[in-house]
């Protein structure tokens, strides 16, 4: 997809940084607002660059416009801000406060030290927890989803994965490419081949060949 100029609802990156700083000052005060703005301006441009492939991929988003009042977009943006602060090696409280802000405003647990893929779509992600795991690109997840390690064992998720509401992937599970985990299904310590739909029921886990392009319901094709 050809890159397009990115416009902001706030108009400028400076105003966007000021908006985030005001929320931090009201909910998680620590530094002065001016200090927060200065620190945020170091990471806002990089976070916006990382929003570009997300905006371009998600069907319901305008590829050329970032709207901080769209809670789905803002959830991703706050994670990216905190993650950029972490990547930069800053060990002050700003990344932690941004993480807390995201939890408070959007009720998601996206820890700043967790590396999510280039394209991820938080679709109504209330109470979702995405923890330590290896994530393939183009991930879609819904509310009450849990991904995380058990002890020292962490999941591996392939590309083009959809985690429907209440899905859980834990331990040393391996989920192949283009798979979907159905609502309320807990995958623990299992290997799932490519192109499968995972169902959970009274008889345990059932794997069925995928007959639908689930990722295509939410993300544009790569060649769009």
Question: Where in the sequence are the language-model features?
Answer:
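Amphipathic repeat-derived elements
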Residues: 43-48, 149-150, 161
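Residue-level signal for alpha-helical context at structural boundaries
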Residues: 58, 62-65, 134, 157, ...
